[in-house]
Amino acid sequence: MKKNPIKPRDTEFLTVAPFPCFNYRVYIIFTDSVEKTANSLVSQGLLKNPHEVDDATRAFTVKMPNQSFVVLVYPYDVDISELTHEAYHAVCCMFKWIGASHEEELLSYILGYLCKIVADDRKAMAKKLEKTT
């Protein structure tokens, strides 16, 4: 198992969606502030500065060139369109990593699988958040 490259802030929930058949991982961060998370990722060397993430940004994807992972950052209250939009970026990054062409059916299955993982992780995060408040 590879070491986790991300150190989450105290107000972040970090999960991972592994794709072992592609030697690829999608890290998922749910946060109270996407802007603070962006700054944290800059300090960890995972995001370039300036990063263009501000208080109007709802969610974003950190694309890691020549790396076997991508990072999705979502607010606690992410909606399905934001969830799917960023997950699509992650799947496209994974396809580039494995050298696959944009094959519609395969991409659709993997996107659906990843969105289900993110949605399930969001529900689990919401339950944890409920217990702490």
Give the predicted meaning of each segment:
Residues 74, 98-99:
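Short N-terminal micro-motifs specific to bacterial/archaeal maturation
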Residues 28, 41, 90-95, 110, ...:
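Generic hydrophobic, helix-prone segments enriched in Leu/Val/Ile
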Residues 81-93:
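Active-site recognition of the HExxH zinc-binding catalytic motif
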